[in-house]
Structures are given as structure tokens and as C-alpha cells.
């Protein structure tokens, strides 16, 4: 038994919008629009109460917010108590800010934490072995938005070597419409041009600093829409 079922059984109208991440068939909800699995930031698919899947054009944070407010303000039975779940995808990795936020936050520089270069010498085994190091684990395409063709042109000059997920750049990118790509591309061009021209000349300290900025720019750009 889920807690929405308990609310429903006690006379509440129930609704759920966004990322469930525990299967795609929520129980005990009168109306739902759920992202399949993790979902996508751009033009995401949603599974409705009947189990049908539809693609909605736009940015996932805006869409989930609009669906939630639409039900809350217009669709629910105002004579009944209600239980509504409003569940954002952001800021789950890989981070894809909206086109506007991508341009805005890529131009920002963020303070570095004192622990950026922590060597974890005095930490436990779990902390030492977790794959959470920006330099050695953060992926070039998946996380930093380096196009696969940029990496290919660099002919082995991209060190350290970091294993990528399949289709980690173009999977999300190719969901964008032509109009959306026109907004993303100038920013992606600037990121890739800088990487191509500077990465091979950087030392590990400089590489860590650059990856930290790319992480913060995309993470905060994604969460700022919430």
C-alpha cells in the first residue's frame, strides 16, 4: 500500500506530476503525468494516468510546474481535500539547463571550495573509492558538454581518459528542436573551442578548476529554473 492510496481511500483527490523514479505506474493517484524513468530535460516524454505516452515541447522544469499549477488551480475538485505530489527532475545528472540559463550561467565564474583539491587521505574507504572526482570521473561529453567530434579531433590528447556513457552528448542534445539548438549551439561552440585550444596545455590543477566551473555552471543553471 502506498501513502497516496491511503489518502485516496480517505476521500482525498490525488495527483502526481514529474519524476517518480520508482516505476512508471503510480498507485493511488486520480491524475498523473510521470516522466519515464529519469526523463529528459528537453522536450520530455510523459506517461499519463491511462498509461499513454506523449511528448511535450519545452523545458522539463517549466512543464512540470505548468502541469502542477494547472491541476491545482483549474482541474481539481475544490469541494474535496487533496494530496498532490510535485516532483522535479532537476538537478539530476546529466545537467542540461534551459537555453536561456545555459547562456547566462556559462558566463559566470564561481568561488572554489577549500576542499576542491582534497586528497581524502584521512577519509574512510567508501569516501576514497567513490567515483565522485571531478577530474577523473566527470565525463567530457556527458557532463562538460564536449562534442564527440571535438574529442575525436584531439587524437588522444584528452587526458585523463574518462569512460563515457553511450550517446551521452547527442542523446539529450538531439531531443532539442531546431529553434532550441540555435540557442544552445553558440554556447556549446564557445565551450568546445576553449576546450580544443586549451585543454592539452593545461596541468591537472587547471583542468580540475575548469571542470569545476563547468559543473557549477550547468548544475546551478539547471536548478535555478526550479
Features from the language model and the residues they span:
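Formylglycine-dependent sulfatase
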Residues: 1-226
Amino acid at each position: 500500500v502506498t501513502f497516496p492510496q491511503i489518502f485516496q481511500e480517505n476521500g482525498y483527490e490525488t495527483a502526481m506530476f514529474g519524476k517518480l523514479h520508482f516505476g512508471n505506474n503510480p498507485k493511488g493517484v486520480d491524475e498523473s503525468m510521470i516522466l519515464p524513468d529519469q526523463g529528459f530535460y528537453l522536450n520530455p516524454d510523459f506517461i499519463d494516468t491511462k498509461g499513454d505516452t506523449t511528448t511535450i515541447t519545452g523545458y522539463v522544469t517549466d512543464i512540470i510546474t505548468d502541469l502542477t499549477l494547472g491541476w491545482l488551480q483549474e482541474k481539481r475538485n475544490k469541494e474535496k481535500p487533496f494530496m498532490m505530489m510535485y516532483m522535479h527532475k532537476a538537478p539530476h545528472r546529466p545537467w542540461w539547463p534551459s537555453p536561456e540559463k545555459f547562456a547566462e550561467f556559462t558566463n559566470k565564474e564561481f568561488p572554489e571550495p577549500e576542499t576542491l583539491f582534497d586528497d581524502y587521505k584521512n577519509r574512510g574507504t567508501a569516501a576514497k573509492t567513490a567515483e565522485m572526482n571531478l577530474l577523473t570521473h566527470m565525463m567530457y561529453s556527458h557532463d562538460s558538454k564536449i562534442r564527440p567530434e571535438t574529442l575525436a579531433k584531439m587524437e588522444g590528447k584528452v587526458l585523463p581518459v574518462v569512460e563515457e556513457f553511450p550517446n551521452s552528448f547527442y542523446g539529450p542534445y538531439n531531443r532539442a528542436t531546431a529553434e532550441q539548438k540555435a540557442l544552445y549551439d553558440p554556447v556549446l561552440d564557445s565551450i568546445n573551442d576553449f576546450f580544443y585550444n586549451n585543454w592539452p596545455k593545461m596541468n591537472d590543477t587547471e583542468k580540475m578548476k575548469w571542470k569545476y566551473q563547468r559543473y557549477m555552471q550547468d548544475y546551478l543553471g539547471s536548478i535555478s529554473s526550479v
